[in-house]
Amino acid sequence: MKSKEELFNMPIVELREYMNSLSNPEIQEVAKIFEEDDIERDPLELLTASKLFDYMKYANGSVN
């Protein structure tokens, strides 16, 4: 998995592609990194990563 610095320095298009390549537990780890960051980021930029919809279902217990 990429480091915090790598994630924050990725262009948004590359970050979306990276998010789509992760498993649900890995997405959860990345989400925690972004939650703990002091810099406010627009979460809507990542919503076009199609894998995030699957993760939201996973996080809410809808998907195993």
What do these predicted regions represent?
Residues 1-7:
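Extended non-catalytic scaffold regions that mediate assembly and binding
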Residues 17-64:
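Acidic, low-complexity, intrinsically disordered interaction modules
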